[in-house]
Amino acid sequence: MGFVLVPKSDFQIPLEADTIRPDLFEGLDLDEIRSLQVYEGNIKRPLGEFFEIAETSHEDQLIRIDGDVSRVKYIGSGMKSGKIIINGDVGLQLGCEMKGGEIEVNGNVSSWIGMEMHGGTIKINGNAGDYVGCAYRGEWRGMKGGKIIIQGNAGNNIGGGMMAGEIYIGGDAGNFCGIRMNGGEITVRGDAGRAPGAEMVSGIIKIHGRISSLLPGFKEISTFKEDGSLMILFKGDLSEKNPEGNLYINYNKNLHILENETDEGRVITKKGIKVIYNSGSTIREGQIIKGGNKLTDDYIDECARCCISPEDYKLLGEPENVVVSSHGNEVVLRAVEDPGIQMGTIFIPRGIWANVLTPPYTESTGSPMYKGVPVYLRKASQGERILSAEELVEEYGVGK
């Protein structure tokens, strides 16, 4: 026997309802189901306070929820069998740590769905938020099995730390799709944001639309046709140890990335040339700040520099200093010609100067937010100088 749940009223305080699971309902009568405990804030209350619950003659181990549960979290968390159908929008952490069964949503869902799931299927006939199939914060191992199907769009950090399983997105995806991916497969039929596959070491990502930017840690391998589209396979992320990640992108929709520009064909605007900025810690930087002091001349010498490809360095007139600008902020840095840098990209050691340029993007933590950022690069004028760490803190309020 199945059950139908209908919210009695709007939820004023978010509800944590991990007891809404077909395998937990099995064998219980209506009174026992109504008595199952949920959390309203930090207070335990019976499920029956919030939902009208009735039996239905439909298939066994079926729960149908009719109504808006966008402020209800953990529905289907850890479920092992059965089916949940939700006719309405759903809140955070739907189906997290799910091991089996099926969840279908006729509406939109919030973030963290299928987090660290092991098996089963989640189907969303609408849009989804961030962190689909990802790992908990502080963990590196995300989705380990199962399948997530999203017919609409999805947000940032899809499949973060994914180990196995499948994620299908019928629409667009946000930034850092497949970040730190270790296995499994992600398919995006629409467009994706910047830096797909950041720090991936294994797994497959297929993006059939346009991507905002491609990290320099991906190497082009081959071209082939799939479903009538010309696709290109890249291997990466080469910034990781022994990477075996496969990133497929649509050739015709990504000519802005795939067509190698020449220095003669690039245009210097008033802002400068548009490049992709990447950052990371260096060994020397670590040695300098080991004692916690970032206010030394050595620190400025190491971190207030911009590594530029020979082509771009020549295009800018072989400058001594450059100005890098992003989202309204700009810094002056010492220009360093580096043959290890790809044309159209720059590298700045992670420090206060890099922090000024990094967008205030908080959906990701750690190094990936310092990767694949579009910035402008120009030759510094005679009156523009490199600011000290103290001056940057005072001007921009960035932390040390």
From Swiss-Prot:
Q: Characterize the regulation of its activity.
A: Inactivated by cyanide.
Query: What keywords are assigned to this protein?
Result: Methanogenesis, Oxidoreductase, Repeat
Q: Its GO biological process terms?
A: methanogenesis, from carbon dioxide
Question: Which principal EC class is assigned to this enzyme?
Answer: oxidoreductase
Q: Superkingdom of this entry's organism?
A: Archaea
Q: Name one GO molecular function term.
A: formylmethanofuran dehydrogenase activity
**7 X 13 AA repeats of [GW]-X-X-M-X-X-G-X-I-X-[IV]-X-G: annotated segments:** 76-209
Q: What induces it?
A: By growth on molybdenum, under anaerobic conditions.
Catalysed reactions, semicolon-separated: N-formylmethanofuran + 2 oxidized [2Fe-2S]-[ferredoxin] + H2O = methanofuran + 2 reduced [2Fe-2S]-[ferredoxin] + CO2 + H(+)
Q: Does the keyword Oxidoreductase apply?
A: yes
One Pfam family in the UniProt entry: Molydop_binding
TM region(s), chain numbering: none
Q: Which CDD domains match?
A: FwdC/FmdC, MopB_CT_FmdC-FwdD
Protein EC: 1.2.7.12
Pathway where this protein functions: One-carbon metabolism; methanogenesis from CO(2); 5,10-methenyl-5,6,7,8-tetrahydromethanopterin from CO(2): step 1/3
**Subunit structure, as described in the record:** Consists of five subunits; FmdA, FmdB, FmdC, FmdD, and FmdE.
Question: Which PANTHER family does the record cross-reference, listed alphabetically?
Answer: TUNGSTEN FORMYLMETHANOFURAN DEHYDROGENASE, SUBUNIT C (FWDC), TUNGSTEN-CONTAINING FORMYLMETHANOFURAN DEHYDROGENASE 2 SUBUNIT C
Function, as annotated: Catalyzes the reversible oxidation of CO(2) and methanofuran (MFR) to N-formylmethanofuran (CHO-MFR). Can only oxidize formylmethanofuran. This enzyme is oxygen-labile.
Task: Report the family membership.
Answer: In the N-terminal section; belongs to the FwdC/FmdC family.
Q: This protein is called what?
A: Molybdenum-containing formylmethanofuran dehydrogenase 1 subunit C
